């Protein structure tokens, strides 16, 4: 999505940056993990296919993707984005008849970045961005039956189950943006690339 191609969103523990070509090799490494492929319902791609996908997502106005940087690693590694990459967060506008509904996805791929609240903060910041900049009024999420960490996280944020698919072995959850007032996202929007310490 072009609208976020020069935007960085800085939170307390994370920095969201647009998914750029330089991020592809690390992202591709993550997506070799059978566990991550299963949890994200993804297929293994060749490196060139991953580069093509990154370009496709950049130009697709129905997809908003940010790479999640671990802010502690960012500060410790001299602002090195690649060494600070922790995962990604996405919004997909799948319904052409209702562009106010977005499917949200989160992946914290780096094991050392899990269990520290980075996923929660990434979701809150992305939801805030979706509501304020992209006019989202409802979020949906599709999560595998066996993905307990994600199910727990989304439930804690107030997402509620609307359906369950035995065929796809997943649960679909929803969250109405008028409930977002009960949640907070401490975020600063900066121009990307970031020039100084965040």
Curated annotation (Swiss-Prot):
- Give the enzyme's main class according to its UniProt record, as a single word: transferase
Q: Which residues form the N-acetyltransferase domain?
A: 14-186
Cysteine disulfide links: none
PROSITE patterns in UniProt: GNAT
Which GO terms fall under molecular function for this chain's record? N-acetyltransferase activity
Query: What's the family?
Result: Belongs to the acetyltransferase family. GNAT subfamily.
Listed name of the protein: N-acetyltransferase 9-like protein
Name of encoding gene:
nat9
